[in-house]
């Protein structure tokens, strides 16, 4: 899994001009699923995201997690995180998981996250418009194959 984690003051996702998910303070996740991803990768990602201390405490130190602050998560599927740009000028996306596998994996990932904090989400495979107000900005890239 490749996940871009952004600390946000707010974020929303719309499909065909209709808002389908919105959060206040929390995390915006751009989630890519690879063909070799396993339940172990999913559990690792959830554990890291829920416990990642990237929110400021009363002293201004990044010492609190999304769970600690009572934050929310907006999760967006994004197979383009597996883009291969080595040849030519058009990225290849053959490194991403096939849609049927990736869709189920993405559902399981969001279900697992939602047992810890409220999760809003986009629609897998849809053309989405994502709006966000970055906080910091703080952006972290998590690759479950690089641990």
Curated annotation (Swiss-Prot):
<keyword id="KW-0378">Hydrolase</keyword>
<dbReference type="InterPro" id="IPR023509">
    <property type="entry name" value="DTD-like_sf"/>
</dbReference>
<dbReference type="GO" id="GO:0051500">
    <property type="term" value="F:D-tyrosyl-tRNA(Tyr) deacylase activity"/>
</dbReference>
<dbReference type="GO" id="GO:0043908">
    <property type="term" value="F:Ser(Gly)-tRNA(Ala) hydrolase activity"/>
</dbReference>
<feature type="short sequence motif" description="Gly-cisPro motif, important for rejection of L-amino acids">
    <location>
        <begin position="136"/>
        <end position="137"/>
    </location>
</feature>
<dbReference type="GO" id="GO:0019478">
    <property type="term" value="P:D-amino acid catabolic process"/>
</dbReference>
<comment type="function">
    <text>An aminoacyl-tRNA editing enzyme that deacylates mischarged D-aminoacyl-tRNAs. Also deacylates mischarged glycyl-tRNA(Ala), protecting cells against glycine mischarging by AlaRS. Acts via tRNA-based rather than protein-based catalysis; rejects L-amino acids rather than detecting D-amino acids in the active site. By recycling D-aminoacyl-tRNA to D-amino acids and free tRNA molecules, this enzyme counteracts the toxicity associated with the formation of D-aminoacyl-tRNA entities in vivo and helps enforce protein L-homochirality.</text>
</comment>
<keyword id="KW-0694">RNA-binding</keyword>
<dbReference type="GO" id="GO:0000049">
    <property type="term" value="F:tRNA binding"/>
</dbReference>
<dbReference type="InterPro" id="IPR003732">
    <property type="entry name" value="Daa-tRNA_deacyls_DTD"/>
</dbReference>
<keyword id="KW-0963">Cytoplasm</keyword>
<comment type="similarity">
    <text>Belongs to the DTD family.</text>
</comment>
<keyword id="KW-0820">tRNA-binding</keyword>
<dbReference type="Pfam" id="PF02580">
    <property type="entry name" value="Tyr_Deacylase"/>
</dbReference>
<protein>
    <recommendedName>
        <fullName>D-aminoacyl-tRNA deacylase</fullName>
        <ecNumber>3.1.1.96</ecNumber>
    </recommendedName>
</protein>
<dbReference type="GO" id="GO:0106026">
    <property type="term" value="F:Gly-tRNA(Ala) deacylase activity"/>
</dbReference>
<comment type="subunit">
    <text>Homodimer.</text>
</comment>
<dbReference type="GO" id="GO:0005737">
    <property type="term" value="C:cytoplasm"/>
</dbReference>
């Amino acid at each position: 899994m490749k996940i871009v984690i952004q600390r946000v003051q707010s974020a929303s996702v719309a499909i065909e001009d209709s808002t389908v998910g919105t959060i206040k303070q929390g995390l915006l996740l751009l989630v890519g699923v690879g063909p070799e991803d396993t339940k172990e990768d999913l559990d690792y990602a959830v554990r890291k995201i829920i416990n990642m201390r990237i929110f400021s405490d009363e002293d201004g130190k990044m010492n609190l997690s999304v769970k600690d602050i009572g934050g929310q998560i907006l999760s967006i599927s994004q197979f383009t995180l597996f883009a291969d740009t080595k040849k030519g000028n058009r990225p290849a996306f053959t490194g991403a998981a096939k849609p049927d596998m990736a869709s189920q994996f993405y559902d399981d990932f969001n279900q697992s996250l939602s047992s810890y904090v409220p999760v809003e989400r986009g629609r897998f495979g849809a053309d989405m418009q994502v709006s966000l107000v970055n906080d910091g900005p703080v952006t972290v890239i998590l690759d479950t194959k690089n641990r």
